[in-house]
Each structure stands twice: as structure tokens, then as C-alpha cells.
């Protein structure tokens, strides 16, 4: 695979290899055949980052070969959304001959939605001034005149200039209901929107007969919490990143959801609070003992669950675990399988044509 060529003819084979690999990895814990959710074969990534290469008068996006570290010119990127591809051409055309925008520009980050909104961040090794702001505003207006719903952001050391806003609002159809998700530039969002919809619908389906409340650790912008709220009496969710918490609060209001509470704290801190080891000012006014959480949802970073959180989640009758790294999932399952059994297993092809796998397991207490 190269940035400008996707081996779409190999999609089925690469997916079959992942299914076999996941089944083999999970064999010590389950004999279930994974439920498989396919990605679109192209234009599936909603975000992308590129370095910029200044080659005389020419200017173009580049990526680096992971093995050789050599640079690769990228004029089109079929893994990314159609909107990103359109913007790549338009941004180069708008910046190439404009000194204020081009000088010391080293990277562009693109974030797009299925609802055809975009944020493009321009990263610089220089101080950004009023001349830059005026040039960027003119470029933004020119892009909008072409029918592109785009926001531009300038970034430099200790500097961030928003011409109007640093977010876009995604709209996803999830099990017959449109969900609105505010996505903030430079914060985590699901990269493959089509796969995100399938993950949300799978999570809804496996929790459809739930009793009691849901606890979620690492909730981000509320991606799963808000979609799953319809299956539970109440949802209590934790997140540490300020922009994500703010986006989650907006998303609660935008989706008219009244049974979700977001707490800004790390999963490790929350574990201490739940176990009564420490009290936190941030939890004043929240009656943790009043929640009857029979299901816990975790979508941890690639490192998986730490040992204290492993112990904490074992106290819940059901654990819904979305993993972006099956190796650390299996490491966690060495502990979790002592108290729980795997009752559902899914493979989500979030990153086609790469070694990476995303998977989901539902664990029920023995």
C-alpha cells in the first residue's frame, strides 16, 4: 500500500487474515467466531495529517515511509474522505503563492465529517500576526465561495488562532436515530465514521436488555455514552481531557439527553473514589452510591486497562470492552476471565490494509 494507492482488490484477503488472527488470539478465552464489520474499501478516514514540503516554487503534502523514513509526495489520499481530497488540492492552490500563508508552514491537519463540515489546521515554525490572519480569512472565504464548509486554524508555538471556531458537528444515523457529535480540533475522534456507526449499533444491540445504570471510563466526547443512554436508566461517564468534556456536555444538550452525567477525572482517580479510598471535590453533589451500575463500558488507550482498573471492572456483572489493541485486551482478559466469560466478540475493520485491529467483547459474570 502507498498513500496514493489502496490495494482494494486485496480487501477481502486482509480482512480474512484479521478474523483468523483475532480468533487465534482469543482462543484461550473464547471459542466464539467473531462478528465481522467491514469498512468501506476507500474514503473511510475522516481525519488526516500531512507534512508540507517546499520544493522551489512548488509545495505539496508528504508522508514518510514507515520502514525507510523516505518522504512520499501525496497529491491524493484515497484512504481519506472525498472532502479531505478536495480540500488538499484547494489548500495547496490557496497557500502556494501566498507568502504570509506559506512561509514556515510545515504541516496541515484535516478533520471532516459525514455532514460535510471541515476544520483545517495550519502549523507553523513562526509567529502568527495580523497579516497571517487577514490572508487566512481571505483563503477561508474563497474556499467557502467554492461551496466548502470549512474552518481554518493557525497554530504555532504557544499560539492558536481560530478564525471563527475550532470544532465541527458530526451527524450520525445510529439505529434509527440521528446523533449529533461535536468534534474539536486536536482532540480524539473516531477516524472511520462508517465503522463508528457500526460499533455504536453493535454496542446498542448487545446491551439492549440492560438493567440498572451504565458506567463508562474514558468517554471522550461522549461517543458511546450518549448512543447507549437509551438502553440504561442512567449513565455515569468519566473523561480527563477538558476539550472532550466540554464537547460531551454540548453533545448531551444537542441530543436532548437527560440521563447522562460526565465527570472530569482520570479512570485511576475514579477507581479510588468508587472504592472509598479518596474523596474528590469534583464529585461533590454526585451520589456515587445512588448509581446501580450493572454494566461498565471501557474503551481504553492502546496500553489497555491498568491493574487497579482491571480489579475495579471485575466488580460489575457485565463489562463491555472496545479495544484498539487486541494484544492488551488479551492481557487484560487473563485477569478478567477469572470472573467473567466472553459472551460476544466482534471485529471492526477500523484501519483497512494495516495490521491494526479494533474489536469488541461483552463479558458476563460467571
From Swiss-Prot:
Residues where S-adenosyl-L-methionine binds: 190, 218, 223, 239, 299
Gene Ontology MF: a single term: tRNA binding
Classification via PROSITE patterns: SAM_MT_RNA_M5U, TRMA_1, TRMA_2
Gene Ontology CC entries for this record: cytosol
GO BP, sorted A to Z: tRNA methylation
Residues forming the catalytic site: 324, 358
Enzyme class: transferase
InterPro entries in the cross-refs: MeTrfase_TrmA_AS, MeTrfase_TrmA_CS, SAM-dependent_MTases_sf, TrmA_MeTrfase, U5_MeTrfase_fam
Protein family: Belongs to the class I-like SAM-binding methyltransferase superfamily. RNA M5U methyltransferase family. TrmA subfamily.
Protein's UniProt name: tRNA/tmRNA (uracil-C(5))-methyltransferase
Protein source organism: Salmonella newport (strain SL254)
